[in-house]
Amino acid sequence: MPYTKYICPDGHEVGIDECLTACRLEGQVNPNTGELYCPAGRCLSKRTLIALADQREWTGTPSTTQLLAGTRENYLKITKEYAIDPKSSLFMLHGTKVHDYLEKYTDDEGISEVRLDDGTSTGAFDYYSAENGGTLYDNKTYGSWKVAKILGLYTKRVPTGEVYKTGAKKGQPKYRNEIRSGGPRHRLDLAIQLNDYRMKIEKELKKPVNNLVCEVIVRDGNTYIATQ
């Protein structure tokens, strides 16, 4: 079953239809802060809440991305009603918008957003290019921390060669964090997803795939935290 409720800013759950009819927290004050829960009358615009409520219905055949989650998690999502925090789910709209925008610029020899069924699962790949012997592209929107883990980047404390001259740490060496490469690359989910799309394209479309590429938009790029 799809999610049927939203989690309000005060932690209570409300049916999506009820939420869209009227915000239950309009004009209500948070007793912990003394401020309105929803200064704009809603936690998010009605348009955004409607967009978040749009979900793909369960057809009986799993999708590639669905199978990346655990079996128990998928079973519960299919058989039980549940609630989501709409503000924490806004990333879904961002990813959908990026895919829809890029699809408009698919070249004549390229193929994009085609859902394939190989008899085991369905999967809609982002973009296939005939260049370089066949290249499959997948577009992602990630935070900088996840990107660093995928690329095998990590921080290491190294001495600066200086010491603290005053304070509680006087005489102790100073350190700074340096970003290093060569760490473990946590990208198993990407490998599973793209290779499943590759096998579907080779089987169903009879096209070669010799390269797998993930194009990532970093949500918090060009921010201080992304450099840390």
How should these model regions be labeled?
Residues 189-202:
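An active-site-proximal "capping" alpha-helix that borders the catalytic cofactor pocket
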Residues 209-219:
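Acidic carboxylate-rich catalytic motifs and surrounding loops in phosphoryl-/glycosyl-chemistry enzymes
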Residues 176-187:
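Surface-exposed cleft-lining segments at the edges of enzyme active sites
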Residues 206:
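Conserved acidic
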Residues 1-136, 141-174, 202, 217-228:
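Metal-dependent nuclease catalytic cores that hydrolyze phosphodiester bonds in DNA/RNA
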Residues 127, 197, 212-214:
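Generic low-polarity alpha-helical segments
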